[in-house]
Amino acid sequence: MAKKDYYQILGIPKSAEEREIKKAYKKLAMKYHPDRNQGDKTAEGKFKEIKEAYEILINEEKRSAYDQYGHAAFENGQSNSTYSTFTNSADFSDIFGDVFGDIFGGNRTQRAKKGADLCYNMEITLEEAVKGIKKEIQIPTLQKCKTCYGSGTRTGTKPRSCSTCHGKGQIHIRKGFFTVQQSCPTCHGKGTIIADPCNLCHGQGRVETYKILSVKIPPGLDTNDRIRLNNEGEAGANGAQSGDLYVQITVKKHPIFEREGNNLYCEVPINFTMAALGGEIEVPTLDGRVKLKIPYETQSGKLFRIRGRGVKSVQNRNQGDLLCRVVVETPVNLNEQQKNLLHELGNSFHGFRGEKNSPRSKRFFDGVKRFFDDLTR
């Protein structure tokens, strides 16, 4: 029976781009997937047909061959076809790939491939980063099939030796004066074929699922730090080792504190009376409030260090410090009495010409005067 056109199977024009091919495949694969149509042989056949069409059209070389020769490019027994040596699952990037690499190196039977590593982005608060915490996360992943235990075969059966390569995982092809060694197109280098696949995973040995993990965040982590959980990534194909899971940390912005390394910074407003006369204030830390002594004549922007109130180093457990930057606040919403008092205070400063009370201002304006005097000379 004549095979249906691959473009018609996916419902796309022959001029379709890669994006259109992927979109059409995703839509049809979800509709006819065996997990959604259990026991429906028609849907199962349709799914295989869709998958075959996608694998050909998404590959540039295979698509080019199909456009030139049609289904004959992938069928055995066509002596006039360039591709007659290979079965439907042939990979043309293998056939026309690094020929000399195959001559001198040669492919070997494929080993079971380790599962892919996964990455999970986790947001935590500054308090959680400083003190450490345990969190549960749920991740989508491929896990080893519990029915076949990753073998991909139905219960009570085993994979059989590939008849094309006789279990070697590789075949030899004549290329003029050379014999080229290639990965077997039937078993894809495995050396075995699953003739009776598992009903649950359909021979893949893995199933899509979600799993919940408890992740311990040690004290001291910062944004862009990563935690590695061994063997918690995707399950490997054909029973191979699982990949790893990397938890990428992002620390949320805090309303009071900023972090630089193991030190914490915060701004503390004080009124100009305390700045001038000194006093004692309470400042926040991540462990509660502590008292901070403000000396007289404190200038705005001065840093005060409170030792041991920062972040513990994740490497050596040394504790950072808290640095408080005081900001002298200009009073607002003054009543008449307060304004009169400030005028009186200001007049007293003027009487001293600011030399004693505002030495910084005096230095600045003296510098400005010298600057303009030099310009007029």
UniProtKB/Swiss-Prot annotation:
Keywords, A to Z, come to: Chaperone, Cytoplasm, DNA replication, Metal-binding, Repeat, Stress response, Zinc, Zinc-finger
- Provide the residue positions that the database annotates as binding Zn(2+) 1: C145, C148, C198, C201
Signal peptide (from-to): none
Which cofactor does the UniProt annotation name? Zn(2+)
CR-type zinc finger locations on the chain: 132-210
Extract the GO molecular function terms from the UniProt entry.
ATP binding; heat shock protein binding; unfolded protein binding; zinc ion binding
Annotated compartments? Cytoplasm
Cellular compartments per GO CC = cytoplasm
Say where the protein is mainly found.
cytoplasm
Hey, which family's this protein in?
Belongs to the DnaJ family.
Q: What is this protein called?
A: Chaperone protein DnaJ
